[in-house]
Regions:
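Positively charged, low-complexity intrinsically disordered leader regions
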Residues: 1-6, 10
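Active-site anion/phosphate-binding pocket segments in diverse small-molecule metabolic enzymes
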Residues: 33, 49-50, 68-71, 75, ...
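Active-site-proximal beta-alpha core segment in soluble small-molecule metabolic enzymes
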Residues: 11-183
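Secondary-structure boundary/capping motif
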Residues: 6, 60, 107, 255-256, ...
Length: 315
């Protein structure tokens, strides 16, 4: 997946891999180490403790913290993590912490809101940011970023183009303000595919690295990196008229063979997946989840599937 996405950008464009939330629910250290070996230039995490985990696992390339919090500024600095600063209060607090730690020109990224309306400075705040930056030497702005709202949606091309126009204007003003070459990054996975002209100096990819590109044409080039599997714990022959599971939400119309699988709510399979709404796969055949999903068990209908206790099941 990395090689495919890498092939879509210019050789000189840096690649940032997003490994927040335990690398999207997998293994952040293992994923990051592999990507570091492949040549990834940067990593991004949501919180400082995730960055510390990567450093402890042997990651040496720069790590961007997308949601830096005042309580963790010292840990962030101690582990050479780069904060994405998105408000004047966060900027002021981080400068103060950096001064207290006695550091000079600590690298920071400035995040601007161009339309997602989640986190970020407004363009109008740039003069105030400049004053804060130029009256100290504890931190140094090295990058400008923003986040696009709908790069995967072809119906939102006009809005994405507007966001890119806003970002471009901010970048030009920032270059003039700080008088240095700033690293600029705005594209996400779908942006890499649909807006290649806006690569700037670096692109960011999260979901694409794990095998999903938000569009069938992209997904066909990607491979999901994880599969949830279990085994059949027990099979039952259920007579017609018998119920299965809590609240008797399934009643057999005829003699039915069921299989119980040892996973459920605790593994992220909510009740909305039960009562025949979704399926699991056994030897390439689909079996519906019947009844209510339990905390650590689900029941499936295997009446027409040849299978045995201990057989592998793909969720």
């Amino acid at each position: 997946n990395y090689e495919y996405l890498r092939s879509k950008i210019k050789p000189e464009t840096k690649f940032l891999a997003v490994v927040k939330a335990y690398a999207y629910g997998s293994d952040a250290q293992a994923i990051a180490l592999h990507l570091q070996d492949l040549g990834v230039d940067y990593f991004a995490v949501a919180y400082a403790n995730e960055g510390v985990h990567l450093r402890e696992g042997g990651i040496t390339v720069p790590i961007l913290v997308l949601h830096p919090q005042k309580a963790h500024f010292k840990v962030l600095i101690e582990n050479n993590l780069e904060p994405s600063i998105y408000s004047q209060s966060i900027l002021s607090d981080f400068i103060l912490t950096a001064q207290e730690r006695g550091v000079k020109e600590y690298p920071i990224h400035l995040k601007f809101n161009t339309g997602l309306n989640r986190l970020g400075f407004s363009a109008e705040e740039l003069p105030d940011i400049s004053k804060l930056i130029h009256h100290q030497d504890a931190v140094k702005v090295i990058a400008i970023l923003s986040h696009l709202a709908a790069t995967e949606d072809n119906n939102e091309t006009a809005f994405t183009t507007l966001q890119l126009k806003r970002f471009d204007a901010i970048c030009k003003e920032a270059d003039a303000t700080f008088k240095i070459k700033l690293l600029k990054h705005v594209l996400n996975t779908s942006g890499i595919i649909n807006y290649p002209h806006a690569q700037y100096d670096m692109v960011r990819s999260g979901i694409g690295l794990y095998g999903y590109g938000n569009h069938p044409n992209v997904d066909s080039h990607l491979i999901p990196v994880a599969t949830l599997k279990t085994i059949i714990a027990q099979k039952h022959n259920i007579p017609a008229g018998e119920s299965v599971g809590y609240n008797r939400k399934y009643t057999s119309n005829s003699e039915t063979i069921t299989a119980t699988l040892p996973l459920g709510h605790a593994d992220g399979i909510g009740r909305e997946y039960g009562q025949g709404k979704t399926f699991v796969s056994i030897s390439g055949q689909l079996a519906p989840i019947i009844g209510n999903v339990c905390m650590d068990m689900i029941m499936i209908d295997v009446t027409n599937i040849k299978c045995s206790e201990g057989d592998e099941v793909i969720i």
